[in-house]
Amino acid sequence: DVSVLILFFNRPKLLAQVFEQVKKARPARLFLYQDGPRGERDMPGIEACRKVVADIDWECEVHHNYQEKNYGCDPSEYMAQKWAFSLSNKCIVLEDDDVPAVSFFGFCKELLDKYEHDTRISMIAGFNNEEITPDITSDYFFATTFSIWGWASWRRVTDQWDEFYTFLDDKENMRQLKNLIHTRRDRKDFIYMCQRHREHGKAYYETIFHASMLFNSGLSIVPTRNMITYLGATADSTHFAGSVHTMPRGY
């Protein structure tokens, strides 16, 4: 009994790899979010993606949110996540380039239930950039950083998100944020990123989520063994600038 949100656009070959793993897990609820076309050139890929996710061969409650206009990566991701968590108290989030191990679904289900009411925990990550973290005997550990390449969380967390970055106008919040960034050796440009994102007038969920975790002293759960194969490490990637050859494998 688990909910899964899948975000996709016009890349059916990548999406098919993700959906193949979802089919093996047979979740009870699927939330399917697709951004709208930028023009006619996007329609073949958009239609092909819809065919991929229409291949549901198990008993499943399905919700569709297919946009008619193009919102872009941001704020689409924020919109999709707020939509899914408005309908489900806890949910796994996958994009079309996050291929999960089948074990990731059971891992999330167990921990979503276990930590549902523990407000110290903000999210469950599937990606471990060390591939296998040494010297840890348990299946997971707690961290103050997190990856968005396959994750799960609760509505209580997304309800804390500040879509309009109002914390930027609060001097005490900013003092605390600067101290946290310094203490944790976090990205020195994080506040600048938040300022730029607000100037753009869009909800960028990465900075919104990160700020929420910082202000609420949130912890992430990270698997000792990586559970996500990230396909987004390609030449046309939106967010990734590294090399596919250095990416850890999903187990």
Predicted feature locations:
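An acidic/histidine-cluster motif and surrounding catalytic segment
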Residues: 1-93, 98-251
